[in-house]
Amino acid sequence: MFSMVEGLQVYGQQTIQAAKYIGQGFMVTLDHMNRLPMTVQYPYEKLIPSERFRGRIHFEFDKCIACEVCVRVCPINLPVVDWEFEKNIRKKQLTSYSIDFGVCIFCGNCVEYCPTNCLSMTEEYELSTYDRHELNHDQIALGRLPLSVVEDSTIRVISGLTKLPKGTMDGHSASKNVTNFLH
């Protein structure tokens, strides 16, 4: 008889424990239901990239002194810099400059260490093509300024989702309070 009462007591404790776990899961679900969706309908809606976003590299041919610092600091020696030495002015003359974005890891070292600031990162991230050879940009393609997301009239810009609301990185803080209450 005593073992039967003890069994019912264990069963009751397990039932209460299961109800706690179900309540915790339900509170997490309710917490997520109150949040705004994080996805956008991509071709028609776009998020504005942050100021530190590392997009396609922009190159200014006139500022480049062909020092090749960008090649030396690149982890994969990616930029191809061709130059000729002009004897009459005793300087290097840049003849061509290219970057293959199919290989580039967008680390930004070339931009950071360029002594003349002829390289900069843009907010352009739409680089997909059907042919990988089209990702090899020469100085003409690199010099083209991208159309800003804000200036494009064919899409709806969503600026409210560029930064997460305060407290979203805390995880399920509301559900933790509920679980502490249930304990």
From Swiss-Prot:
Signal peptide: none annotated. Belongs to the complex I 23 kDa subunit family. SUPFAM superfamilies: 4Fe-4S ferredoxins. NCBIfam families: ndhI, NuoI, PRK05888.1-3. InterPro entries: 4Fe4S_Fe-S-bd (IPR017896), 4Fe4S_Fe_S_CS (IPR017900), NADH_quinone_OxRdtase_chainI (IPR010226), NDHI (IPR004497). It is an enzyme of class 7 (translocase). Coiled coil: none annotated. One of its GO terms (molecular function) is iron ion binding. It is a peripheral membrane protein. HAMAP family: NDH1_NuoI (MF_01351). This is NAD(P)H-quinone oxidoreductase subunit I, chloroplastic. NDH shuttles electrons from NAD(P)H:plastoquinone, via FMN and iron-sulfur (Fe-S) centers, to quinones in the photosynthetic chain and possibly in a chloroplast respiratory chain. The immediate electron acceptor for the enzyme in this species is believed to be plastoquinone. Couples the redox reaction to proton translocation, and thus conserves the redox energy in a proton gradient. Its EC number is 7.1.1.-. It catalyses: a plastoquinone + NADH + (n+1) H(+)(in) = a plastoquinol + NAD(+) + n H(+)(out); a plastoquinone + NADPH + (n+1) H(+)(in) = a plastoquinol + NADP(+) + n H(+)(out). The keyword NADP applies. Residues 55-84, 95-124 form the 4Fe-4S ferredoxin-type domain. It comes from Huperzia lucidula (Shining clubmoss). PROSITE patterns: 4FE4S_FER_1, 4FE4S_FER_2. It is found in: Plastid, Chloroplast thylakoid membrane. Keywords: 4Fe-4S, Chloroplast, Iron, Iron-sulfur, Membrane, Metal-binding, NAD, NADP, Plastid, Plastoquinone, Quinone, Repeat, Thylakoid, Translocase. Binds 2 [4Fe-4S] clusters per subunit. [4Fe-4S] cluster 2 binds at C74, C104, C107, C110.
